[in-house]
Amino acid sequence: MFHVPQSDKKDGYFEIKDPLFTDETFITFGFGHLVELAEPGNYDEKWQNWKLESLPIFPDRYDFEVAKDKGKQFKIVAELLKKANTIIVATDSDREGENIAWSIIHKANAFSKDKTFKRLWINSLEKDVIRSGFQNLQPGMNYYPFYQEAQTRQIADWLIGMNASPLYTLNLQQKGVQGTFSLGRVQTPTLYLIYQRQEAIENFKKEPFFLNNS
């Protein structure tokens, strides 16, 4: 039989009472990415507007900022992280989950050697699996390289999008093709696969097909 934890809902977090946690415990959350890469114009005024002569965009550093519509929740999360002695990362058990969590921790200036970091690493949302996961928390820093990998991918995607999108858009506009064209590491190859499939459908020619049952 499972013990039903008591929870008190607050603004942006829950206060939890459960035998699993002997100390004062809070559960908070993000929605989407609370922290994201800054826009090009934040680095240099010449990158505020799309101009071919301003390309390529390669900042000397990469800054992260709180998403404009998520400032309230970030402030709540940041305050809880700062006062916590132990932080349990319970985002999705993959690289992107690590990236979301650690981006918030670093932006909140909540990373400290004086804090203990733990990781809930589970692959199911069944009650028994979640409870077992909390009973067997992993050292949080063991998964930190996943965050570094994901952030590297995030920056690479940003560079491709912020350079390729204006490059193609401006060149096409010079040729009389109006509109804005978004390019990306994943979306552009995927779009081409869709195009290839559509071409195959439109150019399909019926051919006789014989089935030999002998």
Regions flagged by a language model, labelled:
Residues R153, D157-S214:
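Prokaryote-biased recognition of long, low-complexity C-terminal linker/tail segments
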Residues M1-M162:
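Intrinsically disordered, low-complexity regulatory segments
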